[in-house]
Amino acid sequence: DEAGRLACLLARVVRHQENLTAVADKHIRGLYTGGTLAAESAGLLAERLNITPDEHHPQGMMLNALGHQIVDLGDDFYTVGRPHPMIDPSLRNQLIAELGEQTQVGVLLLDVVIGYGATADPAGSLVEACRLAWALRSESHPLHVIATVTGTENDPQCRSRQIAELEDAGVVVVDSLPEAALLAVALISPQRMAEPAPRSSLLDGVAVINAGLRSFAIDLQSAGTPVVHYQWAPIAGGNKKLARLLERLQ
């Protein structure tokens, strides 16, 4: 069961990766409104990138290594004197828009948390911010945005409507944080050139030794295939009585 789930996850990652331009050697930025989601995302990325997780998280910085950053915008540093980013997304939207000029960042990870108390249309405000960032990017410096949506169909914002709004704008919506981390790392990883497979000698032509019916050899010759015919037949034509007589003669 676990192997099946992993296979499905990897298949989804590959499918997304095939539709996105690689951003090899670029950085990953994560701007999360949920502290638990930010911590899990940081741990997953640290594992995939072989980075030692940070023990201390000043200013909500859950991961800060090799240019990659995962930030918990719900940290006290960002919420003193202002509403939580789930309620007021303006700070995150500003940081997203600023990524338009930070071309070293190739992948942006986001969470969309819906429910009572959250802003009325989290996806809509995120899309506006992403479009501001995308407008400053060229085709040679894309910014891929990967998001997870936490909530249900019964929430006021409706999970499926939020997903549709994000996907229509060009945001990649994935099912889980592990899927988001795997896809992000795959996009920034240098593409390995596949080594050519050794050529089978069968592709260089076929030579046949035919034993038995001569008609097989004739058919092969007519097709231009080199063939050597060896005249052979079962002893005594399969007659057991004659076979025993021949054995005695030998």
Predicted features by range, described:
Residues 1-2, 31-39, 60, 74-77, ...:
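Glycine-rich beta-alpha junction loops
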Residues 1-20, 174:
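Internal gly/pro-rich beta-alpha loop/helix module
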Residues 4-6, 89-92, 104, 115-133, ...:
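Metallocofactor- and cofactor-centric catalytic cores in central/energy metabolism, strongly enriched
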Residues 16-28, 37, 70-72, 107-111, 197-198, 203:
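Structural motif
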Residues 22-23, 100-106, 137-141:
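Glycine-rich phosphate/diphosphate-binding loops that line cofactor/substrate pockets in enzymes
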Residues 66-83, 143-146, 162, 196-201:
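Gly-rich Lys/Arg/Thr-decorated short loops/hinges at beta-loop-alpha junctions or inter-strand turns
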